From Swiss-Prot:
Start and end residues of each stretch annotated as Disordered: 510-532
Catalytic EC class: ligase
InterPro entries: AA_adenyl_dom, AMP-bd_C, AMP-bd_C_sf, AMP-binding_CS, AMP-dep_synth/lig_dom, ANL_N_sf, DltA-like
Record NCBIfam families: AA-adenyl-dom (TIGR01733)
Role summary: Involved in the biosynthesis of undecylprodigiosin. Catalyzes the conversion of L-proline to L-prolyl-AMP and the transfer of the L-prolyl group to acyl carrier protein RedO.
Domain of life the protein comes from: Bacteria
Gene3D superfamilies, per database record: 3.30.300.30, N-terminal domain of ligase-like
Organism: Streptomyces coelicolor (strain ATCC BAA-471 / A3(2) / M145)
SUPFAM superfamilies for this protein: Acetyl-CoA synthetase-like
Family the entry assigns: Belongs to the ATP-dependent AMP-binding enzyme family.
CDD domains named in the record: DltA
GO molecular function: ATP binding; ligase activity
The protein's name in its UniProt record: L-proline--[L-prolyl-carrier protein] ligase
Length: 532
């Protein structure tokens, strides 16, 4: 990028020049901006010494910690793209993602390095760097380099940042795929820089703020926590994996670290507000609360409002991974008494929105429902190595058909109305039900599989319906869940299962999802949490 083009790769360096002694990360592993920048520059120099080129992928698989952020920023400073992997993902899924992304370097920790077998790394990986004690000598036949040796600056430091264009690849974020295989969403430098610039313009944040890094680094919400904070000299509390759903630990962390900016999915905020852990005293430092990823029921939003300091701004942000945040809405007092969900609002700077009906015509009248199409710099170039997909073809035209149904309100704000397809949101994560079905069908005893969601919001649960192969023995729920957990992240493992004699079909011979659970099977459907 030219000097005139904003880029997230300059953020830590520019901030460190002004705030070297100020905290960049707080918590169990605190770092100042000076310390963090020195580490990043040393690691970036080592990457460049390997001969990495612009757009090369750098994978990161470890527990959440400041070194995870260090690996991300170092990859970007070297002109590479980061591929973040959640620490809780099963090895089989990690293997699939690594094979698709073909990274040249893997940053990991001792625990996750020990989980990898000889055949789990693709041939593209030439270097493995790990943090922790008792590191294995090799992973997949590749010697493991201690992280500390990379931080010592033996390769010098990066003095000249790479020249990048807005279209260059910054990250590959893997999401659930309808075909049963995760797909990588390409995030460009231009899109990332545009989002951070909008956030800085919209929010009055600076060096005195502390962001809560609640989201997993493989979730697009994390780009706000990390890069917005680094852009303004604020500190980040990277919420440990074990604390992400522990309301007591979260509430105490908010109080202890005096968190001023919170961003998460609504279900986490609902857990906090319905527990006795979060009190007005714990929340006293909060200056901004933002949420995204799923609908926030208005009664739950009212309960949150009552716990926060008077006047604390609440923001509803919207956008699939393919666009990151593309619309926003600052909650108004009257929104707390709506009968319908809070609006997803208006486009951010650099984004355009169009509502399209089934015939492809633009919808403008208030109340009329259509699919939301997003355009602008925020839109991904497409899915990694899936240029043949229809959505990728649309991306070539700079448009992302979201699959989300919306309508306009009288004032021009958008309201979310549901989905066109079988993609759902659970705890903010995008879940393609077809991927769960594909994983279930890998069990040798299952002939057919279908997945539905029971309930909504924080009470949403996945239920698997299946038929057995001829001659197969009965499968217990524990076995089914263990099987799915070997191929899927925890949030995609079904909570309950129902065995059917036959799968209901529509006139076209396809699974009739509307009849699942409605038709009376030969035996009563198993209640949630049981299997027959």
């Amino acid at each position: 990028m030219s000097a005139a083009t904003p880029s997230v790769i300059r953020l830590p360096r520019d901030t460190s020049a002004q705030h070297a002694a100020r905290p960049a990360f707080v918590g169990s592993d605190p770092l100042t901006y000076g310390e963090f920048t020195a580490r990043v520059e040393a690691v970036a120099a080592r990457l460049l010494s390997l001969g990495t080129r612009t757009g090369d992928r750098i994978a990161v698989w470890m527990d959440k910690q400041p070194r995870y952020a260090e690996a991300i920023v170092a990859a970007l400073e070297a002109g590479c793209a980061y591929v973040p992997l959640d620490g809780g993902q099963p090895v089989s899924r990690v293997r699939t993602i690594l094979a698709d992304a073909e990274p040249v370097v893997l940053f990991t920790d001792a625990h996750h390095a020990a989980l990898l077998g000889d055949d789990d790394l693709p041939a593209s990986v030439t270097t493995v760097v790990a943090v922790g004690d008792a590191l294995p000598d090799t992973v997949g036949g590749i010697p493991v380099a201690p992280w500390e040796s990379w931080e010592q600056g033996r390769a010098g430091r990066v003095t000249l940042l790479p020249s990048l264009t807005p279209g260059d690849l910054a990250a590959l974020l893997y999401t659930s795929g309808s075909t049963g295989t995760p797909k990588g969403v390409q995030i460009s430098h231009g899109a990332l820089a545009n989002f951070v610039a909008w956030a800085r313009d919209e929010l009055d944040v600076g060096p005195d703020d502390v962001f809560a890094g609640h989201a997993s680094f493989n979730f697009d919400l994390s780009t706000f926590d990390l890069f917005t904070a680094l852009s303004c000299g604020a500190a980040v509390w990277i919420v440990p994996d074990a604390a992400t759903k522990d309301v007591t630990a979260l509430a105490e962390g908010i109080r202890r670290h005096r968190i001023t900016v919170w961003y998460s999915v609504p279900s986490v905020l609902h857990l906090l507000t319905t527990s006795a852990a979060l009190t007005p005293e714990h929340a006293a430092s909060l200056r901004y609360v933002l949420f995204a990823g799923e609908v926030f029921p208005v009664p739950q939003l009212r309960a949150l409002r009552e716990l926060l300091p008077p006047g604390t701004p609440l923001y509803n942000l919207y956008g699939p991974t393919e666009t990151n945040v593309c619309t926003y809405h600052r909650v108004r007092p009257e929104d707390l008494h709506r009968a319908t969900p809070v609006p997803i609002g208006l486009p951010i700077t650099g984004a355009g929105t169009t509502v399209v009906d089934d015939a492809g015509r633009t919808v403008r009248e208030p109340g009329a429902i259509g699919e939301l199409h997003v355009s602008g710099v925020c839109v991904t170039p497409g899915y990694w190595r899936r240029a043949e997909e229809p959505v990728s073809t649309a991306h070539c035209r700079g448009v992302h058909p979201t699959g989300d149904l919306v309508s306009y309100e009288e004032d021009g704000r958008l309201v979310y109305r549901g989905r066109k397809d079988r993609m759902v949101k659970l705890s903010g994560y995008r879940v393609e039900l077809g991927e769960i079905e594909a994983a279930a069908l890998r069990h040798p005893g299952i002939a057919e599989a279908a997945v539905l969601v029971d309930g909504s919001g924080p009470k949403a649960r996945l239920r698997l319906y299946y038929t057995l192969c001829e001659g197969a023995e009965r499968i217990g729920l524990v076995e089914l869940k263990q099987h799915c957990a070997r191929h899927l992240p925890t949030y995609m493992v079904p909570h309950g299962a129902v065995r059917l004699d036959r799968m209901p079909l529509n006139p076209n011979g396809k699974t009739d999802y509307r009849r699942l659970g409605l038709d009376a099977p030969p035996r009563p459907a198993a209640p949630l949490g049981t299997a027959r």
